[in-house]
Amino acid sequence: MFIDNVSAIEVMDSRGNPTVKTTVELSDGTKESAIVPSGASTGKREALELRDGGSRYMGKGVLKAVENVNAQISDALIGLSPFNQAVIDATMKELDGTDNYGNLGANAVLGVSMAVARAAAKSLGIPLYRYLGGANAMVIPTPMLNIINGGSHADNSVDFQEYMIMPVGFEDFATSLQASAEVYHNLKAILKSKKHNTALGDEGGFAPDLSSNEEPIQIIMQAIEKAGYKAGEQMAIALDVAASELVSDGGYRLDSENRTVTSAELVDYYVDLCNKYPIVSIEDGLSEDDWDGWKLLTEKLGDRVQLVGDDLFVTNATILNEGIKKGIANSILIKPNQIGSVSETMQTVRLAQRNGYKCVMSHRSGESEDAFIADFAVALNCGEIKTGSTARGERTAKYNRLLEIENEVVYGEYLGSELFN
């Protein structure tokens, strides 16, 4: 069995920007495709997303990345076995010749990497999660649902990028998703009753103008109660601050509250919020460059709150290893397009898990109908997944795939409240 053809075309993502769709065909006729996502708030150490520049699509075209797939990558992979993912990914890494896919583009390489894995699984007649994870792939991830959007994901006054609910008090994924959808709809009703805008942000959450960064939490608490659930027992709250986007004049600018704070003041603010509300997770609470601030945050909250590094670690095993040595954070967000290939993503997850760091599989704000990360989360036993609210098809595609997987995995395990015990 060998790879017979590799190709790519330019398609659209959920924000109306171009992205790369790759297709891999095997010698037995098996054909599979993948669509690459794209982020809005990105860490500066992420692998390079190759864009065309110029006036076409306001500089965001991806025809260069498409051509790299159709020419260089295709030539390098045709004839290779699809069943050795590490060799496939290493071949593309060597072909690129840089640390961050600065020549071929991570959007070209990742698309091919994903499509190869899909084609190999299909050829063997097994699900993708089983192909990548083997017999040990059995944990159905607990969702982190972004129901109020702010920051760079919305055109509103809220500084923090994501306000999420986590259905931790349920026994299976399907019931958790049901409860989350009910909270989401009750949240909409509350926002309407308060005359707030119920327009949606990039990830399907609501994007109202609110008076502070605490008010969204208060409204979510009301929505949980109105839906008939108990905050802290059945529904917990998670935040993605995306603090790198708030850096200003040596501090952090909170426009909605008309103040600039130091790292220590921001950490104290988080401590206060965690004392008042059932917050179990804070992502990117400090800037990717503020390692002293991260150290302080970890000392203050690391024993009781999940502290997730996204821009901080960018799914990079080398950077994560430095964080582990310095005792920074206790969890990592996993975004395959930050590092550029399936194999490198798996390497980072294994490093995190060996060192007691939790792993949260994640979408990007620019998504598609591709649900690869749903299978990937199960394959790697991540335990948690971020893929938006229960609205917008590119978000629900992942949830619907997880519902299918839960029905397939006979010995599947949904951790729920055990995540934070």
From Swiss-Prot:
Its EC number is 4.2.1.11. Pathway: Carbohydrate degradation; glycolysis; pyruvate from D-glyceraldehyde 3-phosphate: step 4/5. One of its GO terms (cellular component) is phosphopyruvate hydratase complex. It is an enzyme of class 4 (lyase). Gene3D superfamilies: Enolase-like C-terminal domain (3.20.20.120), Enolase-like, N-terminal domain (3.30.390.10). CDD domains: enolase. (2R)-2-phosphoglycerate binds at Q161, K335, R364, S365, K386. Binds a second Mg(2+) ion via substrate during catalysis. The active site is at E203, K335. GO terms for molecular function: magnesium ion binding; phosphopyruvate hydratase activity. Its cofactor is Mg(2+). It is found in: Cytoplasm; Secreted; Cell surface. GO terms for biological process: glycolytic process. Mg(2+) binds at D240, E283, D310. It catalyses: (2R)-2-phosphoglycerate = phosphoenolpyruvate + H2O. Belongs to the enolase family. Catalyzes the reversible conversion of 2-phosphoglycerate (2-PG) into phosphoenolpyruvate (PEP). It is essential for the degradation of carbohydrates via glycolysis. This is Enolase.
